[in-house]
C-alpha cells in the first residue's frame, strides 16, 4: 500500500526548540511562543488523513520534502541549509501523524527520507509506503 499527498502552508511548521521556557515560582514551564502552534500543519494533516491506518507491525518508508518559500528565483530548488533542523521538523511531523493515526506507531518507520529545499511556495510533500 502507498499513500502520498502534498499541501501548501502559509507558514512552515516550527519545532520544539523554538518554544519558550520560563521559570515560575522556582519551576520551569514550557510555553508556545507566538506563532509556534502549528495549527495549519495539524489541519492539513487531518484533512489529508488516510481512510485506514497502516496496520501494526507493517514496516514503512516515510519520505518527506519540506519546501521553503524564498523570493530569489535563482535559489529555488537549492538545498535549505539554515534552521530549523531537519531532525526536529521530522520528529514534530511524525508525532502528529502518529496521533492522527496515519500508522499505529512511529516505530513502524524503518526507512526515513527527509529533505529541505528552497522553492516558490511553502509546502510539504509526504509519501508513506509499505516496505
Swiss-Prot record:
Enzyme Commission designation: 3.1.21.10
Cross-referenced InterPro entries: Endonuclease_RusA-like, RusA-like_sf
Keywords for the protein's UniProt record, in alphabetical order: DNA damage, DNA recombination, DNA repair, Endonuclease, Hydrolase, Magnesium, Metal-binding, Nuclease
Cell division as UniProt keyword: no
Cofactor: Mg(2+)
Positions annotated to bind Mg(2+): 85, 87, 106
Lineage, uppermost ranks: Viruses, Duplodnaviria, Heunggongvirae, Uroviricota, Caudoviricetes
Gene: rusA
Family: Belongs to the RusA family.
Species whose genome carries this gene: Lactococcus phage r1t (Bacteriophage r1t)
Catalytic activity: Endonucleolytic cleavage at a junction such as a reciprocal single-stranded crossover between two homologous DNA duplexes (Holliday junction)
Protein name (record): Crossover junction endodeoxyribonuclease rusA
Pfam families in the cross-refs: RusA
Amino acid at each position: 500500500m502507498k499513500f502520498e499527498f502534498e499541501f501548501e502552508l502559509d507558514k512552515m511548521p516550527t519545532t520544539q526548540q523554538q518554544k519558550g521556557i520560563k521559570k515560575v515560582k522556582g519551576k520551569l514551564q514550557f510555553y508556545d511562543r507566538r506563532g509556534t502552534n502549528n495549527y495549519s500543519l495539524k489541519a492539513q494533516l487531518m484533512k489529508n488523513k488516510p481512510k485506514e491506518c497502516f496496520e501494526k507491525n507493517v514496516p514503512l518508508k516515510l519520505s518527506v520534502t519540506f519546501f521553503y518559500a524564498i523570493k530569489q528565483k535563482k535559489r529555488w530548488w537549492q538545498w535549505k541549509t539554515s534552521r530549523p533542523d531537519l531532525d526536529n521538523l521530522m520528529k514534530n511531523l511524525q508525532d502528529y501523524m502518529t496521533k492522527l493515526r496515519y500508522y499505529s506507531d512511529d516505530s513502524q518507520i524503518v526507512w526515513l527520507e527527509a529533505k529541505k529545499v528552497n522553492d516558490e511556495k511553502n509546502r510539504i510533500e509526504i509519501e508513506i509506503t509499505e516496505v
